[in-house]
Amino acid sequence: MQSKLVALLIIVLSFGGCTSKNSDENSSGKIKAAVSILPMKFIAEQIGGDKIDISVIIPNGSDPHTFDPSSKTIKKVHDSDVYFKIGGTFVFEKNIISDLQSNDISKFVDCSKGISFIENDPHIWLGMDESKIIASNIASKLIRIDSKNEQFYKSNLNIFNQKVDSLKSVVHERLSDLSNRKILVYHPAWRYFLSQFNLIEESVEKDGKHPKAGDLRQIINQSNEQNINAIFIEEQFNPDAAKSIAHELNIPIIKVNPLTENLFFEWNNFSVKIKERAN
């Protein structure tokens, strides 16, 4: 991985003298931004609107834990005016972006600034409160780059925050009377979201690995005692990984998408599915 990364970096830097970046910027008049995943694009679009063009580095349907970028993908980062990082321990950014950042630190914005991480869990975009902090960090950078449109970005940030708060109230009312506050997920991605509604995430995966037979038996026994009524698995994962648990507990496997293109939809969708299984 490291040898390939070095080769990619050499290829990227070799484009430096012949890139058409400046002509692209002048013709479009837009800020060229890059992000790691679709949810970050969603937040950035809410703030930047038609003032920015956004490249998503990890394609829809790919697993960020295993994604291996091409030289063309890395060049997108190189050619961008700004890269909105998730920050923290997000694996793709730790493995790839950190090396690129050393060449142009001013380009990279750590959107986790101001967020208190839960046990180094990188899935901050799924927390409704955390998404507002991410949006604020994006707005601050866009204002520094494009100060003449400061009010545009501030207004969009206000609108985004109001939408998040409004949906959060709906979700809170929907989930407030659940008798079972524990939610079983395959991959531990939802703590930021669930904790804001006093729900507890129980995960099958530990440290990115499927449990061994003894640990799996313990999870099944605990889930049975806790009256777990569903197992939620990410669309990017093979549902076969959860089948043995679902079969033993006689519960359904329900797909959710932490890498959604529309956070408003997925927050609402996940909460509806939790509520449906509670009835």
What are these regions (language model features)?
Residues 1-16:
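Sec-dependent bacterial lipoprotein signal peptides
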